[in-house]
Amino acid sequence: MILLLAVPVAATPPERPLSFTKLWTHSHTTPGQLSEIPAFDRRTNTVWVAGVVGVDVLDGETGTLVEHIDVTGYGLVNSVAIHNGLAAFAIEAGPPDRRRAGVVVFYNTRTRSRIGDPVTVGSLPDMLTFTHDGSKLLVANEGTPNAVADTAYTAPDPPGSVSIIDMETRTVIATAGFDNVPQFGTNLRTNVGMDFEPEYIAIDKDGTRAFVTVQEANAIAVLDLSLNAFTEIIGLGAKDFSLPGNEFDPRNDGTVTFINANAYGLYMPDGVASYRWRDRTYLVLANEGDFREDNADRATAGNAPYFAAAPLDRLRISNTDSSPGNLYAAGARSMSIRAVDGTLVYDSGSILDTEAHNRRVYDDGRSRDKGVEPEGVALLDVGGRTYAFVGLERATSSAIGVFDITDPYAATFLDMIVTPGDLSPEGLAVFAFRGGFYLAIANEVPAVGATTTHTTLYRVDQAKH
C-alpha cells in the first residue's frame, strides 16, 4: 500500500523567494514547426527547440532564429538533448507507419552539422537524455500503434523499450524491454504490449539508475545502468478524490466547482525528474494521465454499465479499471514526490487546479477529462533550495506551477507563472548560465487567433532581502 505522508500546502509565503522576468518570446514560423521540447547549449548560448518537422536553434540572448534544422528526411522529431556540444534528436518514422523503428541523429552544436550516421532505435522514440558523464544516451521508445480510433485494438502494437546508446561508439549496446520484469505496487496496468509505453526518463545523481515513467501502465520502471536492464516496475496506486485536499471538478458544465466525490485518479505520470535530499533520491512526477491509443480504453461515467449520477456523470473514466460504483479516471491533476520504491511522500492535491482557477486560466472544458493536466517537470537549484517547475498543458494561457521541494516531506506551492498569448507548455528546460538562472518554456499549441507556437525564456531571480 502506498501512503500519503505529506499534506499539500497551498498558501503563498508573505514574500516570494523567486521572481520571474520574461526576456523574450520566439514565434516559430517554419511551416509545420511546433515548439515542443527545449534544450540549452552553454557552449553557444543557444536554445534548441524540437517540434515535428525540425529543430529551431535560437539565440539565447535575443530569441532570434539562428537556424532551422530540417529532419523530415528522417521522420518527425519528438525530442532533443544536449551534452558537451553534442545535440541528439529523437526522430520517429512518422506516416504512413509510425510503428517502424525510429532513429537518433547527432549534431555538432557549433557548426550545426550532422555527425555520423543515424542510429536506429525502437518504435516511436519520444524522449532521450544523456547520462551525467555523457557516456550513454537513453532513448524512451514509446511504441504506440497507428490506429487511434481502433476500438477493437487489433492494430499491431509495437513493444515499448529503452534503447541504450554507447556514446564512444554511437551504437545501441542494449534494448531494455519489460518482459519478465518483477512487478510491485498497486493499480499497475499489466498488459505489456498495450500499456508499457515509456514516456520520460530521469537519472539519479550517481548515475547508476534511471527511472522511466510508463504512463499508460500507471507505473515507474527502474533501469539498472550497470546491467542495462529493467529490474522492477512499480504500480503507483490511485488518488482518492473523496479525501479533503483532493477536490476536483468532474463536470464541464460552464461552472467551476471543486468538490470531493467518490472517484479515484490513476496517477499515470508523464514527466519525471530526480533529486537528492539527505542522501536519498526522490522522484518528482507530473501526474497528467493518459488513456491508451484506442477508444475502448475510455468511457463516460454516466453511461452504461456505470450509470453514475451527477456530479460524476460526465467524468471520463477508464473502461479497463472501472466498475459500477468504483470509478477510475486518468491522471491525478497534481505533482507528486515519491521515494524510489514508489512510496508517496507528497502530493499537491487540488493546488494546481485551484491556483489556475484563482488566476483565471482554468479551462472548465477540460474538467471532465484531467483538469489542468500537469505535463512536464524541471528542477532548479537556487541559493541552496530546490524548486520544481510544473507545466500545465490544459490551461487557457501557458501556466507553470512553482514549488519549493527542498524537503520532499514539506513541499510548498510558491507561485504560478502565467504567460498570456502562449498556450499548452509541452516541455521545460531550466539552466544556470553566467551567474544567472533561466527557464525555457516550449508551448506547443498556437494561442487563440494565432497560427504559430511560441518558445519563451524567463530569468529566475532570488528575492532580495
Language-model region placement:
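N-terminal signal peptide c-region/cleavage motif recognized by signal peptidases
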Residues: 6-8
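Beta-sheet-rich non-transmembrane sensory/scaffold domains
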Residues: 12-464
